[in-house]
Amino acid sequence: MFKIGNLELQSRLLLGTGKFENEDVQTEAIKASETNVLTFAVRRMNLYDKNLPNPLANINLKDFITFPNTASAKTAEEAIRIAEIAKHAGVCDMIKVEVIGDDETLLPDPFETYEACKVLLERGYIVCPYISNDVVLAKRLEDLGVHAVMPLASPIGTGRGINNQLNLSYIIKNSNVPVIVDAGIGSPKDACHAMELGADGILLNTAVSGAKDPVKMAEAMKLGIHAGRLSYEAGRIPVKYTAQASSPTEGLGFL
């Protein structure tokens, strides 16, 4: 259990709700993950256009912390407008600020992200910005007052795992707010790795929804994240460059 702002998260797995084959698979995967935080793109909801489908219609959102994101925003102004739509619809316990700066890599725009966070904090939101693994930006956003930072492991949807372990480690080490690794996680191994580095949680979607068996993968991710956290808390042995026997050398005098 950990907190973002005044919200208590029962699970360190935050699950995206898009791209599932159907509602039944989505529901079973959510159940298997044991998450209590669901994230979704506001633009995919029927919050401002009732003619659009509601991909969360079969989910009782009262059982979850709702974590909408501002996906599709390319400016701070657009991100703020999307956040306001979610808030007025009553599905915004906290907001993931996602402002894309490049259409090919889908990397976040640091300048627009910062400006959006500044305004949303002034308006009383629990703000969690999605960022690249920029150590300086993470600290500047923390100084601004964000409630968590969400550095990517690798570009959205690539499943490449952690591309820059050094920078991610710096962000985790220097942060006084929760660090949620977001984007690029492809397997439970990737999720476990991020948690072993000391991340507070993992946000993922495609790794589960795109798996051959999303329900099993949701459970695997849950277990991988749990194992990684336990490993971090237990403290791994230091890496050495010479072999060291695990058996005692006493009692070998008779040889």
Curated annotation (Swiss-Prot):
A Pfam family recorded for this sequence = ThiG
Q: What is its main location?
A: cytoplasm
Q: In which pathway does it act?
A: Cofactor biosynthesis; thiamine diphosphate biosynthesis
Q: Which residues bind 1-deoxy-D-xylulose 5-phosphate?
A: 157, 183-184, 205-206
Catalyses: [ThiS sulfur-carrier protein]-C-terminal-Gly-aminoethanethioate + 2-iminoacetate + 1-deoxy-D-xylulose 5-phosphate = [ThiS sulfur-carrier protein]-C-terminal Gly-Gly + 2-[(2R,5Z)-2-carboxy-4-methylthiazol-5(2H)-ylidene]ethyl phosphate + 2 H2O + H(+)
Q: What class of enzyme is it?
A: transferase
Instruction: From the Swiss-Prot or TrEMBL record, state where the protein is found.
Output: Cytoplasm
Active site as annotated: 96
Domain of life of the native organism = Bacteria
Q: Please tell me whether the keyword Nucleus is annotated for this protein.
A: no
Q: List S-S links within the chain.
A: none
| E.C. code | 2.8.1.10
In the record, biological process GO terms are: thiamine diphosphate biosynthetic process
Q: Which terms are listed as keywords in the entry?
A: Cytoplasm, Schiff base, Thiamine biosynthesis, Transferase
What's a single GO MF annotation on this record? thiazole synthase activity
Q: Name one GO cellular component term.
A: cytoplasm
Task: Please give the function described in this protein's UniProt entry.
Answer: Catalyzes the rearrangement of 1-deoxy-D-xylulose 5-phosphate (DXP) to produce the thiazole phosphate moiety of thiamine. Sulfur is provided by the thiocarboxylate moiety of the carrier protein ThiS. In vitro, sulfur can be provided by H(2)S.
> How does this polypeptide assemble, per the annotation?
Homotetramer. Forms heterodimers with either ThiH or ThiS.
| Similarity comment: family membership | Belongs to the ThiG family.
Instruction: Give the protein's recorded name.
Output: Thiazole synthase
Originating organism: Staphylococcus haemolyticus (strain JCSC1435)
Gene name, Swiss-Prot/TrEMBL: thiG
